[in-house]
């Protein structure tokens, strides 16, 4: 069976075949899609949060801020614990150093040394061992004691949003009870009473000093917190205004660049490879 010859192409068809055939349906809506996509990606600016309740302030105390930094109160607790550990180490280590050196000299009277330097070095080694051993015992106990006391006291101050003498008494009682909890119920009660008695004069002195200065520590912190919140609120309002005007700026910039973008798109369309037509396929057949 013979295949019928292809129909002759007209002059208009031949002229149109010189241009590449492309499907540009997606290019028509490119600008609108870009605008919608940019509007969807607008940054969300949350409103700054101000803690009102006691639990919110406690979460702020033991949590981290936007820059992943701990609070100043928690940093002060850590610094105080490190300082107390060093002081306790020195307080327990120096007497132990002297006592261990004297005890070694008394117990080594009958020993024979090669020279005087060897004897002095042996005595210093014994004294250093005593300094490290007893200094460590005093150091970690003092650090833990001060950490528990400051943590309880600071937590009560932050939760109630004020300073009070009862906070020092409660902190001393809790710390003393925890330190004597291994003895039993009697040790727990006795440690709490001793801790409360020790916390009362300390709290009284600090409260008197704050009253003499005219402003408590918690009042100063509250003022600083409010000032920081107002600063964050102003910054949030400024960022919110920028975010509201951002779609208009994007749309205006797209309209300004529209002729240049159209010229680039036309040039890109003309540079695309030519699509095979039905007439060309028939010619090949």
From Swiss-Prot:
Known tissue expression: Generalized expression enhanced in heart and skeletal muscle.
A cellular component term, taken from the record's GO annotations: mitochondrion
Stretches that traverse the bilayer: 80-100, 137-159, 165-185, 189-209
Swiss-Prot/TrEMBL keywords: Chaperone, Membrane, Mitochondrion, Phosphoprotein, Primary mitochondrial disease, Transmembrane, Transmembrane helix
Main location (coarse class): mitochondrion
GO biological process, one term: mitochondrial respiratory chain complex I assembly
Locations listed in the record: Mitochondrion membrane
Membrane topology listed for this record: Multi-pass membrane protein
Modified residues (Phosphoserine): 277
Main function: Chaperone protein involved in the assembly of the mitochondrial NADH:ubiquinone oxidoreductase complex (complex I). Participates in constructing the membrane arm of complex I.
Family, similarity comment: Belongs to the Tim17/Tim22/Tim23 family.
Self-association and partners: Associates with the intermediate 315 kDa subcomplex of incompletely assembled complex I. Interacts with TMEM70.
The protein, known as: Complex I assembly factor TIMMDC1, mitochondrial
Gene of this entry: TIMMDC1
């Amino acid at each position: 069976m013979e295949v019928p010859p292809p129909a002759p192409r007209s002059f208009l068809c031949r002229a149109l075949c010189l241009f590449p055939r492309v499907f540009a349906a997606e290019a028509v809506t490119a600008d609108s899609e870009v605008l919608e996509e940019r509007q969807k990606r607008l940054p969300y600016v949350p409103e700054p949060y101000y803690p009102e309740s006691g639990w919110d302030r406690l979460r702020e105390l033991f949590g981290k801020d936007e820059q992943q930094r701990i609070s100043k109160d928690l940093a002060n607790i850590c610094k105080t614990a490190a300082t107390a550990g060093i002081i306790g180490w020195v307080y327990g280590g120096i007497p132990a150093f002297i006592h261990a050196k004297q005890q070694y000299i008394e117990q080594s009277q009958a020993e024979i040394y090669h020279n005087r330097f060897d004897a002095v070095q042996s005595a210093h080694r014994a004294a250093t061992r005593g300094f490290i051993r007893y200094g460590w015992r005093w150091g970690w106990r003092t650090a833990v004691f001060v950490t528990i006391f400051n943590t309880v006291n600071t937590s009560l101050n932050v939760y109630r949003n004020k300073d009070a003498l009862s906070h020092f008494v409660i902190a001393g009682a809790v710390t003393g009870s925890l330190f004597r909890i291994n003895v039993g119920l009697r040790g727990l009660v006795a440690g709490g009473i001793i801790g409360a008695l020790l916390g009362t004069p300390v709290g009284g002195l600090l409260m008197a000093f704050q009253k003499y200065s005219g402003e408590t520590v918690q009042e100063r912190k509250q003022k600083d917190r409010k000032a920081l919140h107002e600063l964050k609120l102003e910054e949030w309002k400024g960022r919110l205004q920028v975010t509201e005007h951002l779609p208009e700026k994007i749309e205006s910039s797209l309209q300004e660049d529209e002729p240049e973008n159209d010229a680039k798109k036309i040039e890109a369309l003309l540079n695309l490879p030519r699509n095979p037509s039905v007439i060309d396929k028939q010619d090949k057949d």
